[in-house]
Every structure is written in structure tokens, then in C-alpha cells.
Amino acid sequence: MAKKSPENASPVAQFEQSLESLEQLVEQMETGELSLEASLSAYERGVGLYRQCQQALEQAELRVRLLSDPAQPEASEPFDPPSHDG
């Protein structure tokens, strides 16, 4: 069986890869060694990666809601992680 190409993989499956790429871009930009043009290109790519990550998280949340109550996914409460503010 052939592997899915990255372009055909679901956003949820690509989340880890997109997040890692985004983190690498941020590190490159924080060094300050990129030219203005390279910085703009990196920023544009970063925005695209951010959107992919956001879409993957939204799809994952929807899947969790559907699994929690398939009859009424809209009635489920949004997940609020516990605060670590001590």
C-alpha cells in the first residue's frame, strides 16, 4: 500500500510536522541573521503553517466532540485546560 503524500494527509496528521517547521522558522527569524526579504518569506510561510496547525486543532476538537456525544456535538462544552497559574 502506498503512503499518503504530505499534500494528501489530513491536517490533523500533518500537525506535528507543521508545528516543528513553524518552530524552526521562529528560531531562524529570532537569530536576526536573515535578510529583510528572507524574513518576509519566512513570515509568510510561518503564517501558513500557523493556519495549518489551527485547522488541525479545530478538526481534532470536532472529532473529540463527536466521540463524546455523536448525537449532539454542538451541545458539548469547549475544552478549557486547567490553569497552571497557582
Swiss-Prot record:
Disulfide pairings: none
Enzyme class: hydrolase
Record-level GO BP terms: DNA catabolic process
InterPro entries xrefs: Exonuc_VII_S (IPR003761), Exonuc_VII_ssu_sf (IPR037004)
Domain of life according to the entry: Bacteria
UniProt key word Cytoplasm: yes
Annotated spans, Disordered: 67-86
MF (Gene Ontology): exodeoxyribonuclease VII activity
Localization, UniProt: Cytoplasm
E.C. number: 3.1.11.6
Stated role: Bidirectionally degrades single-stranded DNA into large acid-insoluble oligonucleotides, which are then degraded further into small acid-soluble oligonucleotides.
Subunit structure: Heterooligomer composed of large and small subunits.
Family assignment from sequence similarity: Belongs to the XseB family.
This protein's name: Exodeoxyribonuclease 7 small subunit
Upper lineage: Bacteria, Pseudomonadati, Pseudomonadota, Gammaproteobacteria, Lysobacterales
This protein's encoding gene: xseB
